[in-house]
């Protein structure tokens, strides 16, 4: 789903709906963020996982020798991969809460995406959104944010943790504070994207990464 706002430097945010319910509460929360971004002049695209089966990463390393493309050829991964390669200015990932964590299919997609394309996502503002019936939201929120904080991506905050509550589709709209949090997130992301695009200093210098373990 693509949403068009008033274009400003062709800035765009990709939103990934990690729920198997394409039009459920996670989609509704992400749509609130997207509408706010559009009102701020930022174009948006929402890609939904839906009920598609998603292969997990097997650490084969082929993406490092294959032009940053995963060895598994599923349509969903390449749809997200192509959106990132075509150029985005920000990323929002949304998920329902299952057993205190994000949807497993979403994590499988993100594992592959960030392993193969972390350099393309570097310094892009990012945020996660979680929706739950009752509990586990903060644990799922923390899990998703780890992808961003390991990839040199600035986290966009809101007035509260980016979570909303609802069980049946559309019920999340009754969470007034949750919906306001989504709108604040959209405005804050638009602000950060503009500031980064208008900046004169450029990005920080990166050191060559060092990989160690607890043995050496």
How would you label these PLM feature ranges?
Residues 49-69, 168-171:
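N-terminal beta-loop-helix "entrance" segment that forms/cooperates
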Residues 65-160:
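Helix-loop-strand module that forms the ligand-binding subsite of alpha/beta enzymes
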Residues 1-10:
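Short, Lys/Arg-enriched N-terminal segments with co-localized hydrophobic residues
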Residues 12-40:
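N-terminal beta1-alpha1 ligand-phosphate binding loop
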Residues 39, 154-216:
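Glycine-rich phosphate/pyrophosphate-binding loop and the adjoining helix
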């Amino acid at each position: 789903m693509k949403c068009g706002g008033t274009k400003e430097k062709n800035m765009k945010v990709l939103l990934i709906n990690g729920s198997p319910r394409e039009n459920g509460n996670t989609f509704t929360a992400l749509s609130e963020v997207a509408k706010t971004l559009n009102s701020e002049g930022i174009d948006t695209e929402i890609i939904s996982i839906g009920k598609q089966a998603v292969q997990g990463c097997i650490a084969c390393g082929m993406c490092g020798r294959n032009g940053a493309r995963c060895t598994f050829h599923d349509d969903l991964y390449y749809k997200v991969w192509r959106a990132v390669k075509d150029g985005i200015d920000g990323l929002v990932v949304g998920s329902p809460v299952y057993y205190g964590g994000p949807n497993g299919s979403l994590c499988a997609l993100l594992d592959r995406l960030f392993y193969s394309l972390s350099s393309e996502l570097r310094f892009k503002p990012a945020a996660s959104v979680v929706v739950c019936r009752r509990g586990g939201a903060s644990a799922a929120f923390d899990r998703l944010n780890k992808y961003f904080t390991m990839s040199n991506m600035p986290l966009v905050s809101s007035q509260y943790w980016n979570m909303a509550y609802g069980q049946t589709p559309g019920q999340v709209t009754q969470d007034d504070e949750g919906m306001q949090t989504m709108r604040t997130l959209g405005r804050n992301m638009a602000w950060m994207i503009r500031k980064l695009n208008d900046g004169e200093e450029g990005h920080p210098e990166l050191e060559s990464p060092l990989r160690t373990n607890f043995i050496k």
